[in-house]
Amino acid sequence: KRKFVGLDAYKQVIDSGVDVVILTTPPGFRPLHFKAAVEAGKHIFLEKPMATDAPGLRSVMESAELAKKKGLAVVAGFCWRYHYARREFFKRIADGAIGDVQTMYATYYTGPVKPMPPDSARKEEWSDIEWQVRNWYNFTWCGGDGLVEQAVHSVDKISWLFGDEPPRSAVAVGGRQRPNNSGNIWDHIEVNYLFENGARGFLGQRQIPGCHGENNDYIYGTK
């Protein structure tokens, strides 16, 4: 009675008498699930990322405004915002410990997270949608990509450093280095953020096996 299956299972969960909803399904579904939970008056843990495309993000922002009006608790899955040491670190930076911040370079270099299985693993009765949802990480509509689904933590820290003000511009390049005809996500992306004060944030994201691994943040100030 407490287990629900299917693409509409979220409705049954919300209507089952719960007080809090934890949204951790593939992020392509997050805007729809968030909207339904807010409209039902539920408190929510909203895992990152909140969406995989611009329409989804706009929907999430609208739902967030409604949640505020209803007085609902919404906690986002950007874990570093709740890390005491990291919070103290960013506070000291904001207080001028290294002078005026000029640049942040963030790296998110790892191996593949959920490699796409071979086509032979697909059962005959599975539709294209079921196959893609089962392998959601490898399809942009359902999982975003390595930048959206994983390195968004680094994007969040860059935003945090610069006062959560949106950048003036963001220029990116990327592609697929490995020969792989399954799925459609890129395996490497580089982004250059320019902020209003002239400071820049750089983000390097890559998920290729057998390469150097690193998840670091380098911040440079005037001191």
Give the residues covered by each predicted segment:
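Phosphate/diphosphate-binding loops
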Residues: 201, 207-209
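A structured beta-alpha segment of the ubiquitous adenosine-cofactor-binding alpha/beta core
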Residues: 2-23
